[in-house]
């Protein structure tokens, strides 16, 4: 069975992430969307909230699992018996960092491949940070995130 991991913070999940999830799920028998616990970051949503939002927006993709991890991605990949890592690339600026990470991961685990998927052009500008900024100022989110995510964002910023 070919298994891939799509790691990220997903704070929050956007239509750009969902596009990569759908396309990645078509390439592998199983796709694990793995929320990274990064102690140096202060996310808007807890890991539990991010996992629940991801489950809500991927419930209809049968070969997608949602999980979370901390530590090294290569260690997590070994634990879940993943063959590959999927990374979405929006712009050339994403490539330099992601390529460096792919080389490091390959050095740490030579059997683990990184697959780069170019984002759909309509999501090339989209990031979780931009979505949070729009939400903070009460802007319309319908082009960027599913309704459930927009609702949760508005709840966070109305407190």
UniProtKB/Swiss-Prot annotation:
- Which species is this UniProt entry from? Thermoanaerobacter pseudethanolicus (strain ATCC 33223 / 39E)
- Top-rank taxon of the source lineage equals Bacteria
Q: Which GO terms describe its cellular component?
A: cytoplasm
* The enzyme's E.C. designation: 2.7.7.3
Cofactor requirements of the protein: Mg(2+)
Q: Which amino acids does the record list as binding ATP?
A: 9-10, 17, 88-90, 98, 123-129
Q: Where do the coiled-coil regions begin and end?
A: none
Q: What is the protein name given in its UniProt record?
A: Phosphopantetheine adenylyltransferase
Recorded catalytic reaction(s): these are: (R)-4'-phosphopantetheine + ATP + H(+) = 3'-dephospho-CoA + diphosphate
Q: Where does the protein end up?
A: Cytoplasm
Listed GO MF terms: ATP binding; pantetheine-phosphate adenylyltransferase activity
Annotated site residue numbers, Transition state stabilizer: 17
Q: What family does the database annotate?
A: Belongs to the bacterial CoaD family.
Q: Name one Pfam family in it.
A: CTP_transf_like
Q: What does this protein do?
A: Reversibly transfers an adenylyl group from ATP to 4'-phosphopantetheine, yielding dephospho-CoA (dPCoA) and pyrophosphate.
Which GO biological process entries does UniProt record here?
A: coenzyme A biosynthetic process
Binding sites annotated in the UniProt record for substrate: 9, 41, 73, 87
Q: Which CDD domains match?
A: PPAT (cd02163)
- Give the primary localization class: cytoplasm
> What does the subunit section of this Swiss-Prot or TrEMBL entry state?
Homohexamer.
Pathway it belongs to?
A: Cofactor biosynthesis; coenzyme A biosynthesis; CoA from (R)-pantothenate: step 4/5
Recorded hits in InterPro entries, A to Z, give: Cyt_trans-like, PPAT, Rossmann-like_a/b/a_fold
UniProt keywords, alphabetically:
ATP-binding, Coenzyme A biosynthesis, Cytoplasm, Magnesium, Nucleotide-binding, Nucleotidyltransferase, Transferase
């Amino acid at each position: 069975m070919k298994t891939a991991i799509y790691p990220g913070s997903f704070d929050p999940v956007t239509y750009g992430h969902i596009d990569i999830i759908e396309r990645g799920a078509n390439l592998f028998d199983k796709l694990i969307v793995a929320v990274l616990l990064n102690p140096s970051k202060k996310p808007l949503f807890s890991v539990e909230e991010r996992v629940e939002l991801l489950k809500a927006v991927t419930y209809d993709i049968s070969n997608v699992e949602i999980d979370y991890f901390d530590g090294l991605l290569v260690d997590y990949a070994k634990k879940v018996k993943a063959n590959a890592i999927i990374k979405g690339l929006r712009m050339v600026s994403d490539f330099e960092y992601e390529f460096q990470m792919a080389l490091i991961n390959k050095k740490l685990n030579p059997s683990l491949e990184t697959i780069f998927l170019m984002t759909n052009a309509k999501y090339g500008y989209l990031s979780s940070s931009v979505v949070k900024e729009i939400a903070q100022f009460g802007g319309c989110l319908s082009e960027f995130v599913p309704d459930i995510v927009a609702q949760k964002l508005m709840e966070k910023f109305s407190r």
